[in-house]
Every structure is written in C-alpha cells, then in structure tokens.
Amino acid sequence: MSNVVAFLSNKLTLRGTEVAIFDYADYNEKLLGNKSIIITRDYEKIKNEYDVDIQAYNKFQSRFKVCYYQNQEDIDTIVSDNNISHIFIIKAGALDGVISTRCKNIIHCVFTTCQPHGQVYTPIGQSINNLQGTSYPVMPHIVTLPNCDDDLRNELNIPQNPVIFGRYGGKESFDISFVHDAIKSILEVRNDCYFIFMNTNVFYEHKNIIYLPGTSDMIYKRKFINTCDALLHARDRGETFGLTCGEFAICEKPVITYGQSRENEHLLILKEKAVIYNSFDDLFSILKTFTKNKYDMTNNGYMFYNPENVMNIFKNICLI
C-alpha cells in the first residue's frame, strides 16, 4: 500500500538542502510509488529572509502540491487534510517545535543529533554521529544530475584550453580567507586558468574570475560542472554531507578541499580521492601544478548515492 509522505523545509532556497528535498520527494513517487507533498512557509511572508529564492518556490510548485504553514497547528491541519502518513522534516536537529502530532515524524538532522524527537531521528552523514557521540542510522542525500554534454565555455567567452576551477553553494560559505589569497596569487603566475563562482559573494575582481547568479535549473548546473576541470571547495566548517562535492564527484571532477574542517563527511566519503590542502602554500601548489586529467575520480565514494541506493535506505529507515 502506498503512503502519502510530506517533505517539510522551513524555506525554499537554492542550497543543497532543497535540492535534496526535491530529489527525495521526486524519487519517493518514481521509485517507491508513494505520493509526495511539500510543506514550507509562504514565500510572500518570508521573501526577505536570508537565502529565500523564488526560483526554488517555482520549481517545487511546478512539480508537487505545496502547502504552507506558519505554526505547528497548521502542520497538523495539512497532515489531516491530505491523509499524510509520514512527514520528513529536514532541520538542524534540535527540538524546535516543528513537528506533527498526527503522523509519523522523520527528523532529518543536518548539523546535530543532540535532541532526539520524532519516530525516526536520522543524520544526513556519519560525521554528525561522530561529532555528537551518537549512533543513529544515517539517511544520506541523493546525488544525481541530468545527462548533458554541453558546457558554458562559449557562453562565458572562455577558450577551450584554459583550466577552469569552479564552485557553487551558499553565498557566504566560500569563506576561507587564505583561499581567496591563493586565488589572487595564482592569477599573477598563471594566465591559463579561470575561476567561475556561482551564487558566491564577490571577494575579488579579475578578468579571469566570473561570478554567476544562483540557479535551480539542474541542467544549467550540469553545464556549469562540465565547464569546470575541478571543484574548488572552501567552506571552513566543512560538510555534513557535501552535495556540491558529490555533484562534481559523480561527474568525475576532482574535489579540491580543506582538510581541517570539523564537519568532514565529504572527506569520509571521498577518502583518498579528495585533493586536500591545509594551508595557503598547499593550495597554491595544487593550483599551480594542476592539469586536466591529473587526478583519477573514477569509482569515488559519492557514486554510491544514486537514487536507487538512497531510496532503498529511505524505505528501510524512514518509512517504518
């Protein structure tokens, strides 16, 4: 018998959290034969909150029934009105009052497992368990992209030969200052490389640095990855899953990343496939000596997280 499963995020953004929610909801229908409903807060009421993006709202509304809440009572009403059997709530992990009293609650923890609640309490990565000293079953994200061979080099007026390092994610999460310095320095000694940054706060202007707005278009995102020769990842706190790292990795693009982050799920997944720097000098050397096809990304750990494998975990952990 099929279930009606609601997926709740308190706002819809262009970040990995909402990419993950969309994929869970999509494949809950396509692979598990259930019905998916999205629950979030109304764009018009929260449009000035950080990261809220109308593109994300439009994307979800074009695919799913979307219901809006303001408080816990609203959530219960939506659950009753739609005969929802399970509600999958992605949140930091703390007990925050966002829950339903009328169905099974799956609490999907992005940062902490310190306040268990709901019928299922599950982190997005083992690194959260490691940091918190817990042992909850892990519900990882799906890593998938549409098939597309096109890139953006012509559109961005970049020749075919230069090496291109790229990055997307939260606007503020490219935040390691010595990485900014290394980019400035490498552009003084290599004129055959470009940096393209999507949804990234401007930190330096240069003719070989291109800033692009964020997008919810996964085909455009695939073209962006196809344009790049590597991901340059520089989030000081690290990743509790690392969807951007995963999206580059399944396209066999090297992931150049900081090795000292507290949250290190991306390092646990990539293992020896990660291209790690710990200092300005490390990164400068990596960028200076980088050539296309230098690093082998075949059979890297993120390739496990395809829709079939992850939704099998979802069925066994979440749909109890």
Pin down the residues of each PLM region.
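A short, glycine/small-residue-rich beta-strand->loop->alpha-helix junction that serves as a flexible
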Residues: 8-23, 46, 172-177
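Nucleotide-activated donor-binding/catalytic signature segment of Leloir-type glycosyltransferases, i.e.
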Residues: 197-219, 223, 227
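Short alpha-helical segment that forms part of, or immediately flanks, the ligand-binding pocket
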Residues: 222, 245-250, 264-265
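Acidic donor-binding loop of glycosyltransferase active sites
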Residues: 84, 223-240, 253
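Conserved donor-binding/catalytic core segment of Leloir-type glycosyltransferases
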Residues: 6, 147, 158-174
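A charged, aromatic-enriched C-terminal amphipathic alpha-helix characteristic of glycosyltransferases
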Residues: 278-281, 291-320
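Donor nucleotide-sugar binding/catalytic pocket of nucleotide-sugar-dependent glycosyltransferases
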Residues: 111-113, 118-149
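Short hydrophobic beta-strand element within catalytic cores of glycosyltransferases
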Residues: 254-259
